[in-house]
Every structure is written in structure tokens, then in C-alpha cells.
Regions:
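Residue-level signal for alpha-helical context at structural boundaries
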Residues: 58, 81, 85, 169, ...
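Conserved FAD-binding catalytic core of PHBH/FMO-like flavoproteins
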Residues: 1-75, 79-84
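Short, P/G- and charge-enriched loop/turn segments at secondary-structure junctions
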Residues: 7-11, 94-95, 194
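Active-site-adjacent segment of FAD-dependent monooxygenases/related oxidoreductases
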Residues: 13-15, 163, 172-176, 187-188
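Short aromatic-enriched loop/helix-cap "lid" or pocket-rim segments at secondary-structure transitions
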Residues: 24-26, 53, 162-164, 174-175
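A generic helix-loop boundary/linker signal
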Residues: 13, 53-57, 121, 141, ...
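C-terminal lid/capping helical subdomain adjacent to the catalytic/cofactor pocket in oxidative enzymes
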Residues: 114-115, 132-143, 152-157, 174-222
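Conserved mid-domain beta->alpha element of the FAD-binding
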Residues: 62, 86-172
Length: 222
């Protein structure tokens, strides 16, 4: 059945200490009884290294070994994990930004151009923006070569900034900051640990880098 509001995105835990859970609904009433299809992601550090394979099936028991005790009166992550149709496992890695995407009539787009930690939805979102920019320049430019150069000029620098930002100050920074300051002590008011002004500053800084802030979006529509 739906949890919290039925449209809640739930993050629990810190990557650098406990591991992290992320749960969110992606489809309502999948069975006629009001149940939702839930997507979940867990992250934890591991000494095991395997070559990157984005379609490798994982073992849910390996995941549960880290999160079996994570049960709450409003939410039961282990039960949701056990009911998964399948589990995929892959390394959370990026690559250093490169200086050039376009080579004659060939250019790069998406993860081929700027593989990044998928924070803030940017793993897929920036690929969509790449495609939109490339399409726009192919329609407007005098030649395909000119279009590819213009596309690279528009998209290379912004995506480079996001790749680097996701390494040092991703949206997870809010959780990590609160966890560090709370020092394993319970609190009733978030404002006692971090101010609203700090929360807004972290959020707005990331929005500006990603190009989601109000000023950037308004400029694109003018």
C-alpha cells in the first residue's frame, strides 16, 4: 500500500556512515487493490570490485545484509526489498570531464559525453537536455558540422560543472550535514540542527549549477 502521502520520495541514511536508502512510487494501483509499484535504490561502500555492467542482476540478500534492521513504524524497507521482481547491481562511478566531444561528423551525448554520479536526477536529465540542444542546432545551423560544434559549445561547460559538483556537493549534502551535526542524537526540530537559510542555500547552489534555478529557466524561455 502507499506510504506517507502516496507520492513521497523517501531518503534514509548517510552514504558515508550507514549506507543510504531511496524509495519512491512510479505507478499507482498496479493491481486494482490500490497498491503501488515502488522503485528503490540503496547505496553502500563495498570492497568488492566488478567491471561496470548496467544490467547485471544482483542478490537481494546481499542488500538485506546491510539494511535488515531498518524498520520503522511507518515504513518497512526490508519487506519491500524482498518483494522486488528483480534487483540490479552496478558501481556508482563517474569519469573525469573531457575537453572535446565532437570529432568531424561524430559527437558524444549523454553518458558517453559526461558520465556522472546520478544525483538530483541528472544522470538522465542532462542527456535529455543534450538531445534537445543537438536537435535545435541541427535544425538551425547552416551545416551538420556547424551544428555539432554549436551543440558542444553550449553543453560541454555546463555538464562539466555538474559532474564536478556531484562529487563534492550533491543534494545528499543536506543529509550528510544534518547527520554530522546531530552526531547520532535524536532531534524533534530540523531547525535545531540546520537553518532554513542553510537548506535554501544548498538547494539553490545546486539548482544554479544544474541550470534549474528560476533565473536560468526564465532566460531559456525568453
Amino acid at each position: 500500500m502507499p506510504f506517507l502521502t502516496g507520492a513521497s520520495i523517501t531518503r534514509i541514511g548517510g552514504l558515508f556512515t550507514t549506507g543510504k536508502l531511496l524509495f519512491y512510487p512510479i505507478r499507482n494501483n498496479i493491481d486494482g487493490d490500490g497498491n503501488q509499484l515502488i522503485n528503490w535504490v540503496v547505496e553502500f561502500f563495498s570492497d568488492k570490485y566488478e567491471p561496470a555492467d548496467w544490467s547485471r542482476l544482483g542478490d537481494v540478500n546481499e542488500v538485506l545484509a546491510h539494511f535488515e534492521s531498518w524498520r520503522f513504524d511507518w515504513f518497512d524497507p526490508p519487506t519491500i526489498m524482498r518483494n522486488a521482481d528483480f534487483v540490479l547491481t552496478y558501481p556508482m562511478v563517474d569519469r573525469d570531464p573531457i575537453a572535446q566531444w565532437t570529432f568531424d561528423r561524430v559527437t558524444l551525448l549523454g553518458d558517453a559525453a559526461h558520465p556522472m554520479y546520478p544525483r538530483g536526477g541528472n544522470g538522465g536529465a542532462q542527456s535529455i537536455l543534450d538531445a534537445a540542444a543537438l536537435t535545435r542546432h541541427l535544425v538551425k545551423a547552416a551545416s551538420p558540422l556547424e551544428a555539432l560544434r554549436a551543440y558542444e559549445a553550449e553543453r560541454l561547460a555546463p555538464t562539466r560543472a555538474i559532474v564536478l559538483q556531484n562529487r563534492t556537493a550533491p543534494p545528499d549534502l543536506i543529509i550528510d550535514t544534518v547527520e554530522q551535526r546531530a552526531n547520532k542524537q535524536k532531534f524533534d526540530r530540523l531547525e535545531d540542527v540546520i537553518s532554513r537559510e542553510e537548506l535554501m542555500a544548498i538547494s539553490q547552489n545546486y539548482q544554479q549549477v544544474a541550470g534549474w534555478d528560476r533565473a536560468s529557466l526564465k532566460a531559456k524561455t525568453v
